Amino acid sequence: MREIDELVQVEEPAWPELRKMVADGSVPVQVLPADAGEGRRCLLQMQVTARSVLGALALHTGGLLVDDGWVRVFGGGPGAATGLPSLAQVNRFPAEFDPGWHPATGLVVGHDAVGGVFALNGGDPAAAGRPGAPGQMTYFAPDTLAWEAMELGHSGWVAWLLSGRLETFYDGLRWPGWRAEAAALDHSQGIAVYPFLWSEEAHADLAATSRRPVPMREVLGVAAEAARQAGAGDAGFLGEV
């Protein structure tokens, strides 16, 4: 176990470069204010240093709202003040540091407005029913109700989010006017789409669907239940919001 000072006080911290990436990125990004105590709690439980992008996000931000809030990247926020939970809150970290605790199926590091989930694989993804290699990012796709390997680590994923390639990634999941709808959400809300994103109707004409803001926990819960009913298997832990 490494103590908190060893995790925080490092040479070549990632935050200056990450801050520059955010400023120079081709998509709009809002950096939410951090809670210093919550950020340090995240670092201690994850045992990552401030040299990593994951550590920098936890220590220096309350999360990122990418592309007008379409993607929420979790950091070390206070939760109640911003509506965006911290990494500790969304992953149900123990209240006190527990060296034996690890996320059961991977670390949830982001959500998107329609219930997509970004998670970082743990040491044995296959045992958790997840694709990809250990330490690789995965995505729970709300239009297929399945996990997909992204072939990126966490730092590569953050760079990818800021690179302007989201339009291609979300082809078929965005409709005319999506940006205004995402920007109008409270940080604890997602967009409920009906007919559901995984339905033939939505695949055929997404623009014709009806949409409304609802608590994100409802968006995730409906998708998880639909995956079970469709025989796609247990989606697993999608985050506590």
Feature-to-residue mapping (PLM):
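Short aromatic loop motif centered on NTY/YTY
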Residues: 157-195
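Compact, glycine/acidic-enriched structural inserts
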Residues: 129-172
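Acidic, low-complexity intrinsically disordered regions
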Residues: 11, 66, 97, 143, ...
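A surface-exposed partner-binding patch
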Residues: 1-125, 179-241
